[in-house]
Amino acid sequence: MGWLSCLDIEAGKVSLGFVFFKMKPSFILILLAVFVYGFIHSVLASDKVKALSRRWFGPASERAYRVVYNLFAALSFLPVLALAGILPDQLIYRIPSPWTLLSLALQVMAVLMLGMGLLQTDLWYFLGVRQLLQPGASEPNELVISGLYRRVRHPLYTAGLLFIWLAPQMTLNLLALNLGLTVYILVGAMLEERKLLRQFGGAYTEYQKRTPMLIPRLGRVE
C-alpha cells in the first residue's frame, strides 16, 4: 500500500492530489524484471565470467566478447520494455503542451550528451568493434578528464538518468521501470568507480576529489 502523487496541470493551474492505491502486481513485476536484467548484465561484465569464457572458448573469444555482450544486453532488455508496455498501467501525470516540447528537447539534449560522452572516449572499443577487427587491441589506458568529463565523472550515466526522468508522461509502469534503471545505473557507476581506481590509482583519486560523480556543480570548473 502507498500514496501516489497525481499532478493535474491544465489551463495554467496546477493541482496536487494524493490517491491511495494498492501496490499493483505489474509495478512489482517490472521492478523484478529490471533487477534480474541488471544482475545478469553485471555478472556477464565481471572479470570472472570473462576468464571463464577464455578458458572454455579459447583466447579468440575475448575479441568477440564485448560485441556479443552488448548485443545480448540490448536484446535481453526488450522483454523488460515489453512488460512495461503490455501490463495494466495507470497514468500518474502528463505534461501539457507547450511544456511537452521543452521536455522532449531536454531528452534530445540528454541523447546528444550521451553521444558526446561516447565520442570523447573510444566509441568503437566501447561497442566491441575494435577488438573484433583488430586482434590485440588493448583497453584505452588514458584517463579522460576533459569536455563533459570535466563536469562529471560519469556523463553517460548522467545522460541516461536525465533521459528517463524527463519523459513528458509518467505512468505507474514507467515509474517502476525508471526506478529499477536508476538503481541499476547507480550500482553500475559505483562498480565502475572501483574498476577505475584499480586502473588509474592516485590519478583517479585526485579526479574524484575535484569532479562530482553524476550531478555537475554550478559555476566555473577549474
Predicted features and spans:
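Membrane-interface helix termini and inter-helical loops of multi-pass transporters
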Residues: 52-54, 86-96
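Membrane-interface helix-loop junction between the first two transmembrane segments
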Residues: 42-60
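Transmembrane alpha-helical segments that form the membrane-embedded catalytic/substrate-channel core
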Residues: 33-46, 79, 107-129, 177-197
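Membrane-interface loop-to-helix entry segments
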Residues: 69-70, 100-112, 146-158
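A generic, lipid-embedded transmembrane alpha helix
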Residues: 68-84
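Hydrophobic transmembrane alpha-helices
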Residues: 25-40, 138-222
